[in-house]
Amino acid sequence: MIKPDPDSCHLLLDSRFANEEVQKNPYTYNNIREVLSDGALNAATVEHPVTVYIAPGIYWLENPQSEAVIVREDPKDLYPYGCKVNCANLKLVGLSENPEDVVIAANRGNDHGAKGNYTLFHFFGEQLEMENLTLGNYCCVDLDYALDPAQSVKKRTEAITQAQLADTNADKFHAKNCRFVSRLNLYPVCGAGRSLYEHCHFEQTDDALNGNAVYLDCEFDFYSGMPIYQASGTGAVFLNCTFHCKYPQDGETHAQYFTKVGGQITLIDSSFAGLPDTKVAVLWTKYPSVALKCYQANVTYPEGRFTPPEVADSHTVDIDEKMLAEAYYIRKDGETIYNVYNLLGGKDDWDPLGNGEVIRFAGKTDIPTQLLLESEAFELEAGGSSINIKGKCLTFDGRERKCEIHFKIEGDSADSIEIQRVSEGSCLLQLKDSNIDHETEVVLTAQTKEGLQTGAYVRIHPRKVAAPRLTGNPVICLEGKMLRLSYDFTEAENDCSDIIWYRSRNIRVEDKIVTAISQPDQPEKVYALT
């Protein structure tokens, strides 16, 4: 690639420059810290970026051989950062079409060169872009530099520890043709209001990826089962991505979750791959909530070796034939246009792919991608008041849009609840029978005609009445290796007693430990001694 003429808004970083050469031109640098200093970047404004062009080479934030321990510069910092960058609008552009040629690196992690989860960068500003470069933390992984093998560096430790890349408070972040390399807690520039990763490569283990972002034409190397800690907000969207599951060929079926603690995931036109004899079960999360719905369309798996989500769980919504699909893609005349403009355009019409005009002309903007209820659990009491259930539809960038929500009840006691429509986005739930004498639970499902779905539990409680009178004191009798509690009521009653058994070393029960509890409407009258 041709090197640009440097000026205050176009800086050049080249590690091969001699100090004398750098001193002759105020806009050329040979040190990554200096080119990202406040003084070097002060020409940037929100409307006009400073672009840093980076020649092929490895740019270390710290000496990779140093044994110094990095700590938090400020107690308020989330992590010990290698470098804090202040720039209203910053572009980092590698001067090679191969992102492996331009490497910004460190090799520190938690308890290995740092106290805490070492993170290369924190970027302050409104907008951040990266292109044609690798951002890597080589604490737990070797840096193999093909352009000059003599510059390759072995990992600092064999331990897989938290070794992070970067975060930002920017509103907009766009990475194109970049590589993000680490293992545990990859953290590939997280925190922006809107994030797009385009044609990027990721290597990581757990708790690693940005959980609120759009990934387009990206490749992922999964070395463990939970690459996202939580898909926060409106979640993560993967468009035309490939997931390489790097599990051993050991005959075991490996669980490939997307998240550790849940959140919405959307897969469009994506595929999974693994070694020839690797078996993988793909799931969204280990313990999905009743509200969780993840969406997919045209996702392919190696036949016979991968178990897809629609078989493995009930939280998957296929949107291939639904109107909701237009929130993510438009298919016309054999061509697919990914609707990133709908997902990330926001109030300021951000258009990182440059196809916003086509999307607007087609009328496929402001399409919601998430349906939420006020809670994941509601309570109804026999003889009590009705409850008002409200839902809302959100665009991917979090703006609420009007939509018509349809509600239905599912479960063994569904017929005992009446649904009254209040408005296009809410309903009233009322028990038909006020004489219900046991606790039960049903599922409330909410959905839109476009294809959005969510759910919640509705717990039904019997009417509270005064406790019945006992004919005498309760008695516990030993029957072999069983203790039996006996009691009678003065009048015939449906026994809903809540019996709890404790174990204690003394009669004062100061150190009591719960050993058995009753289930709803099933008093635990017998306790087995062990």
Task: Write out the residue ranges for each language-model feature.
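Solvent-exposed loop segments of extracellular immunoglobulin-like
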Residues: 401-405, 491-500
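Sequence-level preference for short, compositionally simple segments enriched
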Residues: 2-368
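A short beta-strand micro-motif common to beta-rich folds, especially ectodomain repeats
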Residues: 437-450, 525-529
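Acidic, Ser/Thr
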Residues: 391-399, 485-494
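Proline-enriched interdomain boundary motifs that mark the N-terminal boundary
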Residues: 367-376, 465-474
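Surface-exposed, flexible coil segments in extracellular/virion-facing regions
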Residues: 413-429, 502-519
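Short, exposed coil/turn segments at beta-strand boundaries within extracellular/luminal domains
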Residues: 399, 447-457, 530
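Short, solvent-exposed loop/linker segments at the N-terminal edge
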Residues: 377-385, 475-481
